[in-house]
Amino acid sequence: MKKQRKNKINRARNLAMFLVFGGMLVMYGGLLLKQFEIIMVILMLVGFVMVLASTALYFLIGLTSTKAAVVTCPNCGKETKVLGRVDLCMHCDEPLTMDRNLEGKEFDEKYNKHSKRAPR
């Protein structure tokens, strides 16, 4: 089965949304267990920290999104943001690159990672 690929900004947004709803569910679980005060307090704090982490992540996504290069996807013709050397179109998952050396090569997330070796 082929692994589904997603745009980097959308993956971060999905994680932040999971943290918000997960935090609310954890806090709701704390309310259901209010007869056990220690467990309730722990669940409320964990849920609150999850919501705070989500807020920080949304803030970082916003900062990163403003610095991303905006390009027009050659496949669907819509504007999308590219983070790093390679990324996927937000609309049609078309592989995009800003590096001319990577044009025509198979899409791989490893192209965005910095290697410790000196470039040749």
UniProtKB/Swiss-Prot annotation:
One of its GO terms (cellular component) is plasma membrane. The keyword Metal-binding does not apply. The chain crosses the membrane at residues 16-36, 41-61. It is found in: Cell membrane. It comes from the Bacteria. The keyword Lipid biosynthesis does not apply. Pfam families: DUF2614. InterPro entries: UPF0295. Keywords: Cell membrane, Membrane, Transmembrane, Transmembrane helix. It is a multi-pass membrane protein. HAMAP family: UPF0295. Belongs to the UPF0295 family. This is UPF0295 protein Exig_0660. The lineage of its organism: Bacteria, Bacillati, Bacillota, Bacilli, Bacillales.
